[in-house]
């Protein structure tokens, strides 16, 4: 988490309307520092800003058909920094798509719907609980 106690979230989606509505929901409901990106490439170029969480669209095919899709972007993010939690978003509710994302080391997979924001909030809360437990475990392991 960032020093100013704001959670830095990267939102990556080629659907400008969905991206803006999600950004507004985050800014209205909690103390987040939000950066939005229309392509995976733009997100990758900004990883030096150290996001706490990345919320990434599965397809990313609306703006440039030759751009990286969500899975390719996820793989690049994990190659650069495996510890950044990435939540995948998609309009697809197919289980094989969700499983594929999890195999590529996504933290969670959420279907775009009217409840997506609530599910994202819960996933973010889970991420920070998990990270706290990891730190405690590391602390105990160091003392063994």
Where are these regions (language model features)?
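Receiver (REC) domain switch/output surface
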Residues: 119-132
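Conserved phosphotransfer cores of two-component systems
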Residues: 47-49, 76-83, 104
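Conserved acidic carboxylate
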Residues: 13
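Alpha4 helix (beta4-alpha4-beta5 surface) of REC/receiver domains from two-component response regulators
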Residues: 68, 72, 79, 92-110
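Hydrophobic beta-strand core positions in alpha/beta domains
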Residues: 55, 85-88
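Heptad-repeat alpha-helical coiled-coil signal-transmission segments
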Residues: 130-133, 137, 144
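Acidic, metal-coordinating helix/loop segments flanking the phosphotransfer/catalytic sites
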Residues: 35-53, 57-62
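Two-component/phosphorelay signaling modules centered on CheY-like receiver
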Residues: 16-35
């Amino acid at each position: 988490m960032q020093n100013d106690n704001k959670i830095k979230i990267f939102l990556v989606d080629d659907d400008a309307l969905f991206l803006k509505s999600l950004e507004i929901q985050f800014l209205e409901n909690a103390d987040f520092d939000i950066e939005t990106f229309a392509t995976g490439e733009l997100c990758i170029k900004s990883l030096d800003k150290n996001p706490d969480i990345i919320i990434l669209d599965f397809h990313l095919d609306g703006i440039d058909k030759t751009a990286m899709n969500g899975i390719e972007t996820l793989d690049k993010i994990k190659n650069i920094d495996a510890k950044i939690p990435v939540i995948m978003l998609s309009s697809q509710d197919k289980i094989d798509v969700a499983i594929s994302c999890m195999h590529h080391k996504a933290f969670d997979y959420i279907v775009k719907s009217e409840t997506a924001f609530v599910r994202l909030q819960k996933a973010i809360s889970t991420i920070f609980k998990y990270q706290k437990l990891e730190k405690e475990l590391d602390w105990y392991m160091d003392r063994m």
